[in-house]
């Protein structure tokens, strides 16, 4: 669950909110059930606006969003406005969202005698794992013959690809 930090200040009956502490939020492409919340003020209601699909929670201090299948940075993708029990609305608090789509290069069929090669992902800083993987490199002879599932993980997102290693013809 992701918390949007807000600060409440009363000034002549008006409510305003502080800044969000983590911005932008990073989610995986097609993420389902991402939760966002602000500190609950008894008696207040909350109006949420999002570029994702609001799955549940409108009117409360906590919502669930399903994100779509188009990667990119979405400014003000989550916005919440608190209205006090006396009907005074605060200023909206906005959160940018980066929808991450991991694209991997290196899939294909290789011979067991082929040299070690470097695996690539469109987003840097993640970790490759699987048979034959050493750091960011794939070694066909270390992996052995067969189909190998290689996984790349970054910021809670992961993507897989298949690499096939064949014996050399006799």
Model regions and ranges:
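Proline- and Ser/Thr-rich low-complexity, intrinsically disordered segments
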Residues: 16-170
